[in-house]
Amino acid sequence: MGYCPNTPDEIREMLAVIGAGSIEELFAPIPAELRAKSFDLPPGMSEFELMRIMREKAAAGGAEIVPFIGGGIYDHIIPAAVDHLSSRAEFYTAYTPYQPECSQGTLQALFEYQSVICRLTGMEASNASLYDGGTAVAEAALMSLRITERNRVVLDASINPLHREIVTGYLHGLSAEAVEVAPDGCGSDLKRLIDSIDEETAAVIVQNPNFFGSVQDFSELAVKAHEKGALLIISGYPIALGLVASPGEMGADIAVGDGQSLGNPLSFGGPYFGFIATRKRFIRNLPGRIVGETIDNQGRRGYVLTLQAREQHIKRHKATSNICSNQSLCALRGLIFCASLGRKGFEELAVLNYDKAQYAKSRLTGVKGVSVMNAGTTFNEFTLSLPKDAAPVVEKLLACGVAAGVPLVQYYPGMDNALTVTVTEKRSKAEIDRLAALLEEALCS
């Protein structure tokens, strides 16, 4: 709510009601030595003056830096319709009510969101969102334990390292085993992943594109996992799904990912939303809210929160998830983003990301001593090998107003020279050319 200070007349009226002659008399019972003498605050400012100061502070904090950073969170366009529609009073809340008969508008929007996620992932059922990509991966791992009644999960080490930490933390609390399989260069080691699957394995978790930016086909891994009774979980980058084969097409049982890139701005950690989708036969093990479509006794279409017996307000400790308020406002933004672009626009956006990244790859590898570490296909993210440690180089470019990428040594010891660069549709040719020039200058100094 807005803050409207009391006028002098209102203050006098309130004091009269309680029988006090002044503010000083009101606080007289408090000993003088305990009262604040002065707050030493500057005089108030106009809205314009305050906005100018806040813009200056934002600029000092790096708001004007050109980002080539990805690693799970990406700088994408946001159509004006996303901000406009999601800020309507009917939607402007991040809370989803427990009541199955809550606002039909809210429920229909979330139902449409679920439909969009199913189309993107090639799956049959989706929930109404989770906190973020990391918790979505972890919830998928827990889901696989319930479905298979096993307690071992194989993790590809080329998935987002932060997501890996969340998964291992969740599994540790349940005394379940997490087995990490080292990558093969910048790609998943499919042979070692397959060899790691045994009769106690609940699921294999991979990411496509992975943290290094490599795109791979996991169809064979899905077949081998199913032969052993295990599930395949694929964590995906939603924008890439406009160009890359979906988890469903590859035979995955559960698809997850972070929805930040779908209409949600960069925001120092959130709030964002995570998506999770699965096959229809696993829907009762799907965590979180699920909105269903039905027909009432008058033949009218309606929407309800369905399959609620899975949830904590009914089953408590037996619930499939203890997440109660989901990220429905962020998920709504994701829906509006996808609807604004449409199928063709979404595909064009993915192609634009790919093309710009390919141009950047060619420009950056033109710098002496720089090479691409990815052996196969990449989307809008790729990993470079520099002739010197990447972290100091990134610091030099940051001083010039360019965030050059993610030095991998912080996540993968021994990869001191590796730098993962991300190029979205927002990066211009001039910005890419400047990155190449600054990189060359930094490597020569």
Swiss-Prot record:
EC number of the protein: 1.4.4.2
Q: Which InterPro entries match?
A: GcvPA, GDC-P_N, GDC_P, PyrdxlP-dep_Trfase, PyrdxlP-dep_Trfase_major, PyrdxlP-dep_Trfase_small
Q: Which UniProt keywords apply?
A: Oxidoreductase
Native organism:
Citrifermentans bemidjiense (strain ATCC BAA-1014 / DSM 16622 / JCM 12645 / Bem) (Geobacter bemidjiensis)
Origin organism lineage: Bacteria, Pseudomonadati, Thermodesulfobacteriota, Desulfuromonadia, Geobacterales
Quote the gene name from the UniProt entry. Answer: gcvPA
Q: Which Pfam families match?
A: GDC-P
Q: Does the keyword Oxidoreductase apply?
A: yes
Quote the protein name from its UniProt record: Probable glycine dehydrogenase (decarboxylating) subunit 1
What catalytic activity does the UniProt entry give for this protein? N(6)-[(R)-lipoyl]-L-lysyl-[glycine-cleavage complex H protein] + glycine + H(+) = N(6)-[(R)-S(8)-aminomethyldihydrolipoyl]-L-lysyl-[glycine-cleavage complex H protein] + CO2
Family named by the database record = Belongs to the GcvP family. N-terminal subunit subfamily.
Q: Which GO terms describe its biological process?
A: glycine decarboxylation via glycine cleavage system; nucleoside metabolic process
Q: Does the keyword Oxidoreductase apply?
A: yes
GO function terms (MF aspect): glycine dehydrogenase (decarboxylating) activity
Coiled-coil parts of chain: none
Subunit-level organization? The glycine cleavage system is composed of four proteins: P, T, L and H. In this organism, the P 'protein' is a heterodimer of two subunits.
Q: Which HAMAP family match?
A: GcvPA (MF_00712)
The entry's function note states: The glycine cleavage system catalyzes the degradation of glycine. The P protein binds the alpha-amino group of glycine through its pyridoxal phosphate cofactor; CO(2) is released and the remaining methylamine moiety is then transferred to the lipoamide cofactor of the H protein.
